[in-house]
Amino acid sequence: MAQTFSEIGKQEALKQLFDGSGFAAAGTLSQTAPAHRVFLEGVDFNLVYFPLKHLGYKAVVAVTGELFAAMRHPESLSVVLGVSAKLDYEQISELFGGVKAAAKEFGYKELSLDLQPSKNGLCVSVSASGKQLELTRVRRPKPQSKDLLCISGRLGAAYLGLQVLERELVRFESGSSKAEEMEKYKMLVGAYLHPEIPSGIVDSLEDAQIIPSAGVLVTHGLADAVKRISRATGLGAKVYTDKIPFEGNSFELGRNIDVDPISAAMNGGDDLQILFTIPILQLEKFRKDFQTFEIIGHLAQAEAGTVLVTPEGAELPLRAQGWKEEESE
């Protein structure tokens, strides 16, 4: 019987697709692979409530964050839009306006655009490449147990913001819209529609002579990001529940919609925050110079696995979508 993706898991499927090819999949610590992301209408966004300019901006953030996580300076950005018949020139111009704004903000030197017809809604495909300084490459330390797990911002907010938008869409369609709720949870909604990353983070780290030993962008929840770092470094990792940063209204909204913000942080999507591992000897300097980052855990010996540590000290194995159960042990 043919295996399904749900049985094999995304990560194992990717690994097996490379088996016997003579190629190795570019990993978390790769310095040459371009960053690439595809956004599909109806899967990754809903144009009923997603402003086109925000969509263009977010698409660039998604690939730029991958470059920053690998300590690369943005160089070139390539965008291909699959355009459906329902979209006109003005709408595509609005979307590309968001792309251009982000490209300027993050310092890209080249920007290209291609347009293709689409029968199945809007498709936004973005690829970015960047350059790592030779001195940074030489200085990059080997990942070690006790390296600190440091996150650039709040987690779970994008997933919770999406729930607010979806709930408001249902109300809008039934004629019972609540504008005051959108205002109340605007920070959560903003985390989903218009995520932000620190544009000068690579320069700042290089100037401070703090070079992360590893880094990933949180795209499918913190659990997935930690497991990707664990696979790339060959080490375990411990994340502490009480150290995870949340947006202010996360727990109030979580109670209202019966969603645990911790689960949203661990397995929600599109937070687009950068997770670095910083050598523990750089702790005091990093805390002083990068106060917007939160220290949420540390790398550990491989036998420790990847775990979530509760305030009571219990260690719970991380589970992440796309990973087989044995990969989560």
PLM feature segments, named:
Residues M1-E329:
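Helix-biased detector of long, well-ordered alpha-helical tracts
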